[in-house]
């Protein structure tokens, strides 16, 4: 059985968003990544951010040799949000918010206002697969 990896909120995928937000002059209240800040300080003409969903360190180390391109070019290992679902992690990346702030924890969620379970990324009813045009709210944690 593999070891449970706990999120490190100072070195996680959320901190990529925080660093990019700071770089672009957007509001940010999360920790940034020193290594990424150093790279961005080089004043590149263009910066491209690519997210490989599910590409964690364990599958890389298990399936690739030490001399593989990806292994040789690892700069830093980060953890993911928790839970590390596609919806949760990519929403944190996209909006620079902790999971409790955005509230998108899983692929399918129940929305009481419309009495439906929706697959939020593909905008479909979880049971009928009907496309649903619904403005998904982010969590309101102002209380």
Task: Report residues per predicted region.
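Active-site nucleophile/metal-coordination loop of metallo-enzymes that catalyze phosphate/sulfate
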Residues: 1-47, 54-141
